[in-house]
A protein has these predicted regions:
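Alpha-helical cap/lid subdomain in secreted, periplasmic
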Residues: 2-191
């Protein structure tokens, strides 16, 4: 997807915004680890003397079967393609019930997925990304005010009976206002 974006628009972007997590939760994706570790010999100096030590060395996990691994793969690729652009991640919104037909019923966030995880676990991983990859993360899970698990908030979602997952026009307006205030505090480019 990032290659397609780069082919179509090249460097002509102000910023790259990645909204992720909700499909990973619904798809029962394991969280995984940010790093793998291996003991290695390393040269170092201290007190005027050089010597060799054995220390754990961590490298980024590129395990695409996990959320952290997928984030690492995507962030490495984005950082390499767009080193002068601001990259911003968004946490998912809260999730209400959704039914898109037989075989596609999605319980609300009040239920664990098949990994035994709640949506909050995925939100936490996305928030951690800021520290691993030096990118801002806008926590729309917390800041948007959209809470489809409460019937009074169904007015912001597509259908109160079948789609409390996707925001409607008013829900998008709330999300847009949240993003406007958060994004205005960030520089777009480093040039």
């Amino acid at each position: 997807l990032t290659d397609k974006l780069h082919q179509e628009v090249g460097e002509d972007v102000d910023a790259i915004i990645v909204f992720l997590g909700t499909n990973d939760y619904n798809g029962d994706l394991p969280l995984g680890n940010w790093f793998t570790e291996k003991a290695e010999h390393v040269q170092r100096g201290k007190g005027g003397k050089d010597f060799e030590d054995v220390r754990l060395h961590r490298t980024l996990s590129m395990d695409q079967g996990t959320l952290r691994g997928r984030i690492n793969v995507a962030m490495k690729h984005l950082k390499e393609l767009y080193p002068t652009k601001q990259i911003v991640l968004l946490t998912p919104l809260h999730r209400g019930y959704a039914c898109f037909g037989k075989g596609n019923r999605q319980p609300s966030e009040d239920y664990q997925n098949e990994q035994g995880l709640y949506i909050d676990h995925y939100v936490d991983v996305i928030l951690e990304t800021a520290h691993v990859w030096a990118v801002p993360v806008i926590d729309v899970f917390a800041l948007s005010g959209l809470l489809p698990t409460m019937p009074c908030h169904w007015q912001y979602f597509c259908n109160e009976e079948t789609d409390q997952l996707h925001p409607n026009t008013e829900g998008h307006r709330r999300l847009a206002k949240t993003l406007l205030t958060q994004l205005s505090a960030l520089p777009c480019t480093w040039e």
